[in-house]
């Protein structure tokens, strides 16, 4: 267990030495907040960041510029020059969200020399704290060098069902749980390790980071021997525990 002081440690977890660095975030319980935090982290290190999605995303309350276009790979150079910017396909007024791009469009964007870091929200969760992927999910660009699977610790020790888990039928199939069951850490470990679970559709040779958000709310329910199983079995390269709304956002980090 290590407390995070030097962000360079996180850059290693994320495979951020690769240029461009494409990081896709999946799961539920803090994806968008994590994207914003990562953008600030990379910007503070002198990297230029573009934030986008392969699904739908609420427009940010931010001073960072927002770009709408049909094909991000065809954007003029000046559109990609901001320290941090958002890029979407179009605005969906009925949903109050911006629609993003197909994963292939983001893969094409990586060929642009102006691109340094591309952060992708690659999954939807309807605002719920936990989910399992449907057949068509998640939508991860093949150019991703890292995928972060987010889960909220708020539900650990709580009764779960369709009211607080997105894609409940898929989640129940993977974990074997029934409605009203109390969620245990071992159930999250099962979701991480299952081939149709949290890291479904992750490209080959892609780094995998498991992030339990809102960790302070469930710290007493975390058994380290259970937590580290995905790391010991090489299902993930790193495990982060923290709260993206607090400081430090990543309080603990486990690596092999």
Which residues does each predicted region cover?
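Conserved catalytic-core segment of NTP-binding enzymes
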Residues: 96-102, 109-112, 123-234, 252
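Walker A (P-loop) phosphate-binding motif
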Residues: 5-43
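Structural motif
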Residues: 27, 54, 89-92, 212-216, ...
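Canonical P-loop GTPase G-domain recognition
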Residues: 229-252, 256
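General beta-strand structural signal in soluble alpha/beta enzymes
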Residues: 25, 49-53, 87-89, 118-122, ...
């Amino acid at each position: 267990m290590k407390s995070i002081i030097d962000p360079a440690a996180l850059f290693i977890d994320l495979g951020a030495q690769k240029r461009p660095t494409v990081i896709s975030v999946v799961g539920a319980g803090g994806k968008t907040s994590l994207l914003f935090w990562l953008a600030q982290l990379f910007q503070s290190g002198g990297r230029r960041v573009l934030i986008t999605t392969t699904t739908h995303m609420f427009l940010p309350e931010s001073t960072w510029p927002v770009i709408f276009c049909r094909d991000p790979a065809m954007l003029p150079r000046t559109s990609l020059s901001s320290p941090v910017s958002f890029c979407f396909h179009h605005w969906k007024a009925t949903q109050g969200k911006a629609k993003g791009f197909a994963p292939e469009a983001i893969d094409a964007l990586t060929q642009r020399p102006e691109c340094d870091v591309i952060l992708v929200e690659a999954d939807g969760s309807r605002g719920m704290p936990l989910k399992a992927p449907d057949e068509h999910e998640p939508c991860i660009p093949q150019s991703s060098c890292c995928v972060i699977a987010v889960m909220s610790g708020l539900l650990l020790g709580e009764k779960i069902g369709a009211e607080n888990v997105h894609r409940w039928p898929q989640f129940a199939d993977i974990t074997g749980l029934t409605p009203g069951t109390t969620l245990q850490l071992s159930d999250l470990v099962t979701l991480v390790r299952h081939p149709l679970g949290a890291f479904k559709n992750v490209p080959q040779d892609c780094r995998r980071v498991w992030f339990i958000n809102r960790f302070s709310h469930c710290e007493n329910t975390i058994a380290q021997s259970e937590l580290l199983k995905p790391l010991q079995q090489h299902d993930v390269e790193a495990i982060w525990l923290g709260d993206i709304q607090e400081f430090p956002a990543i309080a603990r980090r486990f690596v092999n």
